[in-house]
Amino acid sequence: MGRAYQNRKLSMAKTAGAKTKVYSKYGKEIYVAAKNGGFDPDGNLSLRHLIDGAKKDQVPTHVIERAIEKAKGGGGEDYERASYEGYGPGGCSVIVDCLTDNNKRTWTDVRNCFMKTGGNIGSPGTVAHMFEHQAVFVFKGEDDEAVLEELMMADVDVIDVEGEDGKITVFCPHTEFYKAKTALNEIYPNLELDIEEITFVPQIDHDIAPEHVDKFEKFMAMLEDCDDVQEVYHNAVLPDE
């Protein structure tokens, strides 16, 4: 699962190549987090996590500060979260998370992505049961058993630890995110985390047949072009991954 997870993240990152899209995504998320939970990252863990992620993805400081200042000013857009589920090209399971100020527009845009690439959008719960809400950490390392032992000694609830190709992937319940991150930083000072996030991890991977690869990549690109789409979770594994 670790290798497939890392490859899945890389495939998503390729479609998210445009810097303006990355900046917009973080700007919107930071604005909503600050508006709903307070402007101080020390007292708003969601905001702190987003700021840390933005810095890791090289989002300029002025983009972060502008989003927080916008939230402080009050008014502005009233975004709400929307989630859509269905089956993408080749039969893979897909969850699309959005932030929107117009549900009808967003629903139409996301539905078109499914329909124009041979997929099917479903009702809530269609595929959500095929994913688990987890905290995931990826970093350089070889000894996954030692990492598991150290985390257990730190009283962290661990779902799995995998080691492959010089990378360690740690999976925990999403509620253990900050506890696990704190423990990892204490166990391994100066640790550089390649990935640190709360996400939806598929229970079972789904191999995409070669004849469906082009449509799958088009599907992902179309979703990435939707301004309201923030995250896309899927269980697709492309050939040679």
From Swiss-Prot:
One of its GO terms (biological process) is regulation of DNA-templated transcription. Keywords: Cytoplasm, DNA-binding, Transcription, Transcription regulation. SUPFAM superfamilies: YebC-like. GO terms for cellular component: cytosol. It is found in: Cytoplasm. One of its GO terms (molecular function) is DNA binding. It holds the Pfam family TACO1_YebC_N. InterPro entries: Integrase-like_N, TACO1_YebC-like_2nd/3rd_dom, TACO1_YebC_N, Transcrip_reg_TACO1-like, Transcrip_reg_TACO1-like_dom3, YebC-like. Belongs to the TACO1 family. This is Probable transcriptional regulatory protein Ping_2063. It comes from Psychromonas ingrahamii (strain DSM 17664 / CCUG 51855 / 37).
